[in-house]
Amino acid sequence: MISLRTHAARSLLALGALAAATSAAAQSGAPDRAVVGIAAVYTPGYQGGDDYRLMPFPVIDVTYGRFFASGREGVGYTVLDGSAVKVSAGATFVPGYRRRDAPVGVGRLDGGAGLRVAADMRLGEVLVSMSATKVVSGDVDGALVDASLAYPVRLSERLSLMPSVSATWADSQYNRAYFGISAAQSAASKLPVYRPGGGVKDVSMSLSANYRLNDKVSLGATASLSRLTGDARKSPIVVEATQPSAVLSVAYRF
């Protein structure tokens, strides 16, 4: 099973937010939508790694009433859908990493399901998003809090851009599962034992573009740069603290 890396997930989130904003502006009054497509994702094998992968990933964004399902937000229900504030709750996938991507001896970290609560607010032209995720299955553990600021700009009837900045806080359980080195892993990998604490684990910036070929088909692109911070950056598994990622996509709206 292909797991979406944290960097690529963030890039798809930004790209999806821009596409949704563009679609809403172009087709107001039609809240239900079904968008499918394919994306080419360039991403590190894991946060902090120095090997990169180019892989395909499906684009899915379905909304029916207050229910939604998408590759960027998971599946869930919109509890509050106001003109300036939207609050939702649901479940999403929290990625781990493959054995072949991690340093020798560290082993595989299976991703799992997470329960997610999110709030999106519009402050003038600025989009503010916050979410909290509690991991409930898999080898990954703990909780994550994400916050982002974005500024969508419509350059023409077809072309929109959106720069954004974001940060992720992780508790000690998550950081120990993802970035920690246990005694057994230390013996197998020759890396030192490491028990990180919680804190802001990364900050990122991205630029997304969406181009509507027509009312049904759109092209998307996102380039992102993320930097690990705090105890996550000090982990023995971190080779590159600053990592790029990119997504190119084509999507069809039914």
From Swiss-Prot:
It comes from the Bacteria. PANTHER family: MLTA-INTERACTING PROTEIN-RELATED. Its main location: membrane. It comes from Caulobacter vibrioides (strain ATCC 19089 / CIP 103742 / CB 15). It is a peripheral membrane protein. Pfam families: MipA. InterPro entries: MipA (IPR010583). This is Putative outer membrane protein CC_0351. Residues 1-26 form the signal peptide. Keywords: Cell outer membrane, Membrane, Signal. GO terms for cellular component: cell outer membrane. It is found in: Cell outer membrane. The keyword Glycoprotein does not apply. Belongs to the MipA/OmpV family.
